[in-house]
Curated annotation (Swiss-Prot):
Post-translational modification: Activated by phosphorylation.
Residues recorded with modification Phosphoserine: S101
UniProt record similarity statement: Belongs to the phosphohexose mutase family.
GO BP: any one term: UDP-N-acetylglucosamine biosynthetic process
GO CC annotations, alphabetized: cytosol
Protein's name in the database: Phosphoglucosamine mutase
PROSITE patterns per UniProt: PGM_PMM (PS00710)
Single GO MF descriptor: magnesium ion binding
Protein source organism: Afipia carboxidovorans (strain ATCC 49405 / DSM 1227 / KCTC 32145 / OM5) (Oligotropha carboxidovorans)
Length: 448
């Protein structure tokens, strides 16, 4: 069954366009009913990033949850992985993160976590959607059974201690100068504080949110500012988080980008040497570079690919028994520690390797030579451009052009109206020609 509201990562769209107070109210009521358990008072934790619209959506969701008898614990601005962790730690029935992750400030979204801290399955999301479209007046709580809402103090300290416990107790970051870009988002308080507690010399940028500057020319979607700051401050490493801190990219001391594939290579090789891999391999998506696959094969490690989306990576990790997976965009999942992507915890694992080896980050974190990879986006307003016969014919012609010396991936984004066209192969010019053929056909189809 096609889903009406939920995409690959919750519900997401323009605030007061797609994500309205009415929608948030319905999500709160429907999810509250789905996650009621027995007769005791049910609890939901709600976190958010720093978007201006977060206040509006949070208030509407509180109304929805309390109207069906659920108590609400408000966490305030806090990373998405912290919400997942606290949902489980605080024995809540449900967790909510109000965020549009790496999207511009005008967008917002709603992510839901079950009592174990994992994102909801497609089946549960469909149950919630069905209730959202039903008249549930008769299922609202009686006046004496309405829920209560209150703000919870100390949640930042809980997450900081959780993150620090993922490192060996004796490990210190003393001697490391770290620039961290918090994207003016949910991590602006907790991550600089945690790095300082671990002994690092911390320089924070993107840590002055005003409700409208989240992800604006900063964070993991715009790492140039971080690269400049790392060089300016002669830092050892830079950490770039996104708006809700569930993904991370890094910068070496020379100002060069370290993407999610390279981070996975660093962690996988280190964990293999330490005997910490549950199975000899990792899980990635179809977007991961073939260079990573070749590197892992040289280490005797396999690489399982999934569709794009950290939820699909996690599903395969759980199904096949892997404890490390991720995406080139910087979603890194380490199931020994977390139930979802955690940008900061992933960064800590890399910092631990850097400290252990005592070598420059540029030597530690570039483990393989990536194959040339071209990624272009085509935005559309409506319809299904990929079903256009001319587009399909052009994709087939582009694949013939590569002649088995590379690969093409053309897909619709699950979070915004964009077609992503990715090409990869040993011959960059041939790959770019193939990608441009498809982009041109899509652009004509969109205009038509």
């Amino acid at each position: 069954m096609a889903r009406k509201y939920f995409g690959t990562d919750g519900i997401r769209g323009r605030a007061n366009g797609v994500i309205t107070p009415e929608l948030a109210l319905k999500v709160g009521q429907a999810a509250g009913l789905v996650f009621q358990r027995g007769e005791y008072r049910h609890r939901v934790v709600i976190g958010k990033d720093t978007r201006l619209s977060g206040y509006m959506i949070e208030t509407a969701m509180v109304a929805g949850f309390t109207s069906v008898g659920m108590d609400v614990l408000l966490l305030g601005p806090i990373p998405t992985p912290a919400v997942a962790m606290l949902t489980k730690s605080m024995r809540a029935d449900l967790g909510v993160m109000i965020s549009a992750s790496h999207n511009p400030f005008a967008d917002n979204g709603i992510k839901l976590f079950g009592p174990s801290g994992y994102k909801l399955s497609d089946e549960v999301e469909l149950q919630i959607e069905e209730l959202m479209d039903e008249n549930i007046d008769r299922r609202l709580a009686q006046s004496t059974q309405l829920g209560r809402a209150r703000r919870i103090d100390g949640v930042h300290d809980r997450y900081i201690e959780f993150a620090k416990r993922t490192l060996p107790r004796e490990l210190s970051l003393e001697g490391l100068r770290v620039v961290v870009d918090c994207a003016n988002g949910a991590a602006y308080k907790v991550v600089p504080e945690a790095l300082w507690e671990l002994g690092a010399d911390v320089i924070a940028i993107g840590a002055e949110p005003d409700g409208m500057n989240i992800n604006k020319e900063c964070g993991s979607t715009s790492p140039d500012a971080l690269a400049h700051k790392v060089r300016e401050m002669r830092a050892d490493i830079g950490i770039a988080l996104d708006g809700d801190a569930d993904r991370v990219l890094m910068i070496d001391e020379r100002g060069h980008l370290i993407d999610g594939d390279q981070l996975l290579a660093v962690i996988a090789q280190s964990w293999k040497e330490d005997g910490r891999l549950a199975k000899p391999g990792i899980v990635t998506t179809v977007m991961s570079n073939l260079g990573l696959e070749r590197f892992l094969a040289g280490e005797g490690l396999s690489m399982v690919r999934t569709p794009v989306g950290d939820r699909y990576v996690l599903e395969q990790m759980m199904a096949q028994g892997y404890n490390l997976g991720g995406e080139p965009s910087g979603h890194i999942i380490m199931s020994d520690f977390t139930t979802t992507g955690d940008g900061f915890v992933a960064a800590l694992q890399v910092l631990a390797v850097v400290q252990k080896l005592g070598r420059p980050v540029s030597e530690v974190c570039h483990r393989f030579e990536p194959l040339p990879q071209i990624l272009k986006n085509v935005r559309y307003r409506s319809g299904k451009p990929l079903e256009n016969p001319k587009v399909q014919s052009t994709i087939a012609d582009a694949e013939k052009k590569l002649n088995g010396c590379g690969r093409l991936l053309v897909r619709s984004s699950g979070t915004e109206p964009v077609i992503r066209v990715m090409g990869e192969g040993d011959d960059r010019d041939r790959v770019e020609e193939a990608v441009d053929m498809i982009v041109a056909a899509l652009s004509i189809g969109v205009a038509a």
